[in-house]
Amino acid sequence: MDIHKEKIIILDFGSQTTQLIARRVREMKVYSEIHPFSLPLEKLKELNPTGIILSGGPCSVYDDDAPHSDAGLFELGVPVFGICYGAQLMIQQLGGSVEKAEKREFGKAEIQILNDSDLFAGLDVARSHQVWMSHGDRVEVIPDQFEVSAESAHSPYAALRHRSKPFVAVQFHPEVVHSIIGTDLLRNFVFGLCKCQATWTMQGFIESNVAAIKEKVGDAHVICALSGGVDSSVVAAMIHKAIGSQLTCVYVNNGLMRIGESEGIIKFFKENTDLHLIDVDASDYFLGKLEGVTDPEVKRQHIGLGFIKIFEEEAHKIDGDVKFLAQGTLYPDVVESVSFRGAAPIKSHHNVGCLPDIMKLSLIEPLRELFKDEVRELGVELGLPDEAVHRQPFPGPGLSIRIMGEVTPERLDIVRRADVIVLDEMKKHGYYNKVWQSFAVLLPIQTVGVMGDFRTYEHVVALRVVDSRDAMTADWSRVPYDILGDISTRIINEVRGVNRVVYDISSKPPATIEWE
């Protein structure tokens, strides 16, 4: 079974929720990919999409430098779904007009369904439905052959459809949870208009990728960067299933791990798997490279290049022809490393964009198409223990990006001790598995405090706890005050050098989950 035979292509115009669109489609067991809006029409044809979604974006379609996709996509004979900016672009390119709205719409809004065909098939037309609006422009004139499917108080054309072609458009964002009927609309597009089959499954993914890995590797050997996290553990299990003893896993202690983590990872894999595992202590090397470095991008690049250097060194020590390096790059890593205009990354990832041109090993990235929750699902399908599959994410650059500013032994010690307390209290109160991620961040400032009868001027630790489904978006977790209080009290009392603890209540977007 070809799990990629049917695919929904999403053209990205810069929306903060474009990845959510892809994820919602994947949840329906249909494959989806994100590409920049500037994807040439010939390339789009080669992808052979079953359907196309035009994402939202921050621009206005009438601006001189507004991003425009090739209007030829409407001649490909496949269904097209325009969302917010994508809807306005569709209307403009097909003969309608868009102008600045007299009243902008941001946040929750109510729409009334006027036509229950296509997107709104099966929905109750007798009542209004909550959706999420985010726009300052609106459609003024609709093209010939288009008709209104839904309206809101300030958007008479909240949803539109072509009378004879499979083109639909909405002014709101069906991909976000605040649009109560959003999933229904996407499902109607994917299965109703596009006639997709639900062929994107993890069992199918395993079968397809095991065969691909065998063919690519042949008789050569693979070295796998094993960190102990969910991603690298699943990578190791997948490749081991494909080539068995041709795989050697290397765990590198970069000196930036949490207390007892390196020892625990090595013990876990040696006791629970039959992977061939080599452990390398490179603490001094990495800490030396980070000395005096404060820029988070430079930190990530030093760490990424350092890992490659060590893996190449270890590859020379292994019996057999080592030609490949396996690592746990995920789809959000790839998407976030390039903006919708093909430049200006949100942040570089140590797995993406930090690889030197002179690297002598070819890459194998079997998870490159997957979102985080799909990786967990894959791990379960591969038979990995719950402990490996459901642990909270930990960044590849380790604690270096949870220390704002220079990484020093003293500052590492502070954030390590604080982190232990955070995780201990979250587990003790039964909250560890209720949240996506929970950790401590050491800030580059000191504040005045009083301990006993003495004035102090010491470090500040920030707590970061978030709820998420796939790390594409996240909200700060409403952790009960008593848990936060216990964490704060313990950190201030037990971690020397800290006199203040604050709680980060930022969502993603606009913030990222990690501080660097």
From Swiss-Prot:
Pathway: Purine metabolism; GMP biosynthesis; GMP from XMP (L-Gln route): step 1/1. Residues 200-391 form the GMPS ATP-PPase domain. One of its GO terms (cellular component) is cytosol. Residues 7-199 form the Glutamine amidotransferase type-1 domain. GO terms for molecular function: ATP binding; GMP synthase activity. Keywords: ATP-binding, Glutamine amidotransferase, GMP biosynthesis, Ligase, Nucleotide-binding, Purine biosynthesis. It holds the Pfam family tRNA_Me_trans. It comes from the Bacteria. It catalyses: XMP + L-glutamine + ATP + H2O = GMP + L-glutamate + AMP + diphosphate + 2 H(+). The active site is at C84, H173, E175. ATP binds at S227, G228, G229, V230, D231, S232, S233. InterPro entries: Class_I_gatase-like (IPR029062), GATASE (IPR017926), GMP_synth_C (IPR001674), GMP_synth_GATase (IPR004739), GMP_synthase (IPR022955), GMPS_ATP_PPase_dom (IPR025777), Rossmann-like_a/b/a_fold (IPR014729). Its EC number is 6.3.5.2. PROSITE patterns: GATASE_TYPE_1, GMPS_ATP_PPASE. It is an enzyme of class 6 (ligase). The keyword ATP-binding applies. Gene3D superfamilies: 3.30.300.10, 3.40.50.880, HUPs (3.40.50.620). Homodimer. Catalyzes the synthesis of GMP from XMP. PANTHER family: GMP SYNTHASE [GLUTAMINE-HYDROLYZING], GMP SYNTHASE-RELATED. This is GMP synthase [glutamine-hydrolyzing]. It comes from Desulfotalea psychrophila (strain LSv54 / DSM 12343).
